[in-house]
Regions:
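Bacterial signal peptide processing site
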Residues: 23-25
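Short polar catalytic/cofactor-binding loops
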Residues: 58-62
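Gram-negative bacterial Sec-dependent N-terminal signal peptides
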Residues: 10-17
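C-terminal motif of bacterial Sec signal peptides marking the signal peptidase cleavage site
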Residues: 19-21
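Active-site-surrounding "flap" and adjacent substrate/cofactor-binding loops of secreted or lumenal enzymes
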Residues: 101-107
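Bacterial N-terminal signal peptides that target proteins for export
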Residues: 1-9
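Extracellular, repeat-based ectodomains that mediate carbohydrate processing or recognition
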Residues: 37, 54-57
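An alpha-helical repeat/solenoid feature that recognizes helix-turn-helix modules
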Residues: 27-50, 64-96, 110-150, 155-207, ...
């Protein structure tokens, strides 16, 4: 009799364990893509402290950061991220910020750009470095910021007959081609620098942005799009690399560039910076795509490629939008809580992050850690709303 009771108890306990396990799995699924679950709040502060400790150890003697040596772009991203950490942590690490700012200032050029000696990706580096200076002390670095604004406005495509470049900025100083990512980074810098919405730079940008939008309403005569509200990388659709996510086939067999996460978030953010209202059909179309494709597990349509830059763009866009939740069908996501938990779960023991799927330099721990600190700062602000 005693033996039968023991067996029964064991079976009952096993059944309970299975029920708990299934409940935990369901909760995990809901937290990744569904509504709030009452899970423990992510320890954002602790994660940031560990990440800052890593960056202290990783800073080069010249004040810069980067796995391949100091770089203006990576250093700018680190400084911009550190500018937003909790004030007490920031004060304890003021020396890191001071050294980083000195490194940025040491790389100013006469044309207003801020770039390493190799002169590569001048627009991208200038946009990032200038935003870092704005975040630290706008008035103190006003002359440098003003010079960078003039430089950036000067490299925007201004020939209306050049559909590949008009209204956009690319990686470098040339005016041969532009893309949604570099244009968005530059426009964000111009917005933070206070460039008037009446400036022609925004009007030209709107033309470029409309050409990257997968919307038949925005498309020029004879141009077919995926018409899903998302965005692509370039404004000219019949070239290789028009979308980082490749192409899709329309019902009539026509291949068109596929929308993907980073481009669509960049589009929405840029439309808002350029002055377009939230209730505008173009803005609503982009936001609907974002809601429909919401996830914190991957970069929509690109999997793990560029995952951390996607997070970096995601938080800037959604914080600008201002809603702490996203609706996806019947599910309601607390995106800041879910994203913070996901980022923290990926942090390494030394406080850093890297992406095993090395694309766009995401094997560099200083770069990716800057993305993550910035993203966690944004999540924290939204959770405090």
């Amino acid at each position: 009799m005693r033996t039968r009771w023991c067996v029964l108890v064991v079976l009952m306990l096993a059944g309970s364990m299975m029920l708990v396990s299934c409940g935990q799995e369901e909760q995990g699924r809901q937290q990744g893509r569904g509504g709030d679950t009452g899970a423990v709040k992510p320890d954002i502060r602790g994660s940031i402290e560990n990440a800052v400790a890593f960056l202290r150890a990783a800073q080069h003697k010249d004040g810069g950061w980067g796995a391949r040596g100091s770089g203006v772009g990576i250093t700018g991203l680190v400084i911009e991220a550190l500018a937003g950490i909790p004030e007490d942590i920031r004060k304890k690490n003021a020396d890191l910020i001071e050294k980083g700012v000195k490194y940025i200032l040491a790389n100013r050029r006469k044309d207003g750009s801020i770039v390493n000696e190799d002169g590569m990706v001048a627009n991208y580096r200038t946009s990032i470095a200038t935003r870092a200076l704005i975040a630290i002390d706008r008035e103190k670095y006003k002359d440098t910021i003003d010079a960078a604004v003039k430089y950036t406005k000067g490299i925007q495509g201004t020939d209306p007959n050049d559909k590949a470049k008009f209204g956009s900025m690319g990686y470098g100083s040339d005016k041969t081609k532009g893309d949604i990512i570099n244009t968005a980074e530059a426009l964000e810098m111009l917005e933070k620098a206070g460039v008037s919405k009446d400036d022609d730079v925004w009007k030209r940008a709107m033309v470029f942005l409309s050409r990257t939008h997968n919307s038949d309403e925005d498309a020029e005569a004879g141009v077919k799009t995926a018409n899903d509200g998302g965005a692509i990388y370039r404004s000219v659709r019949d070239v290789e690399g028009a979308s980082k996510a490749g192409t899709i086939k329309l019902p009539d067999g026509t291949e068109v560039p596929r929308s993907y996460g980073g481009a669509t978030y960049a589009l929405l953010k840029s439309l808002l910076f350029a002055g377009m209202k939230k209730d505008h059909p173009r803005v609503q179309a982009a936001y609907k795509w974002i809601c429909d494709h919401y996830t914190v597990k991957e970069h929509p349509e690109l999997g793990q490629q560029g995952l951390y830059y996607f997070y970096f763009t995601m938080v800037r866009t959604l914080e600008l939008w201002g809603d702490p939740t996203i609706k996806q069908g019947a599910a309601v996501h607390n995106w800041a809580e879910q994203l913070a938990a996901q980022i923290i779960s990926l942090q390494k023991k030394d406080g850093s992050w890297t992406n095993p799927k090395d694309k766009w330099w995401e094997s560099d721990p200083a770069l990716v850690s800057a993305y993550c600190i910035f993203s966690l700062n944004s999540c924290q602000r939204m959770l405090e709303k």
